[in-house]
Amino acid sequence: MRISTYSDLHLEFGSGWMLPPAVNGDVMILAGDIVTLSDYEPLDQILRKWRKPVLYVTGNHEYYTRRPMSEEDNRFKAWLKAKHPHVRLLLDEEVSIGGVNFFGGTMWTDFNRADLRAMETAGSQMNDYRLIYNPDETPFTPADSIALHKNFASRLLNWFGKNLSGPRVVISHNAPVINPNSKYRGGPLTPAFNSLDMVGIIETHQPVLWVYGHTHECDDQTIGQTRIISNQPVYPGLGGVECKDFDEAGLPVEVGV
């Protein structure tokens, strides 16, 4: 199976970015921060040109609408079902396609096991905690992020515990591990997009591939037999492509069955 991957296209900023004709594969992964869920039109233009299976996980920017996340999820699923049934939205869920097993979700951060300083800094500085709302219409908080992270991790481990034939691929928006060359390594907000517990999970369970986004840095590294990649242009309409290693063709990966 040939998999093309993208994240952080940020089409909400009017970049007009479109899939290049050279993109070729069996499955496309969209690992979040593609659009804000108040306007589907930029995404619609891309999905009309790609009729093969798409696996989508939401990022934080999808929810910058000041409406409850659960409400946005339901509206988005209904829109996809009506207009693009070849797209599967994964909300801490699994799906198998062509013998390959996928698990995906946003994977909100656990703030490196509830680092209080990072939680306070993020809560006061990041748009997530002003623009995103919980199902009960209260503002999203770092504590809510930790609770959602625990749900992701629990379901992921349950999936790894299943007796499935075929390779396994994990999709998240937040990073499962810091890029060794990251300019953000050791920064005060690094725990706001990285969770320490995922490294041990990767080392133990060894999925063949983990695809993520969010960091505004491209990545291609391995932990044991697991390849970890991120292919993100980041704000392509605002002064060019931020990640110079961005592959317009989707950084295609072959996953054997």
Task: Annotate each predicted stretch with a short phrase.
Residues 1-72, 134:
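N-terminal active-site segment of His-dependent metallophosphoesterases
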Residues 1-4, 94-104, 222-227:
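Beta-strand-turn-beta hairpins that frame and shape the catalytic cleft
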Residues 5-7, 28-33, 55-60, 88-92, ...:
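Active-site neighborhood of phospho(di)ester-bond hydrolases with catalytic His/Asp-centered motifs
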Residues 10-17, 35-41, 61-71, 94-96, ...:
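Active-site environment of divalent metal-dependent phosphoester hydrolases
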Residues 45, 71-75, 188-196:
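Charged helix-capping and loop-helix junction motifs
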Residues 53-127:
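A basic- and aromatic-enriched beta-loop-alpha substructure that forms the phosphate/nucleotide-
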Residues 96, 182, 188-209, 216-257:
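Binuclear metal-dependent phosphoesterase catalytic core
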Residues 103-169, 174-185:
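Active-site-proximal loop/helix segment associated with metal-binding centers of metalloenzymes
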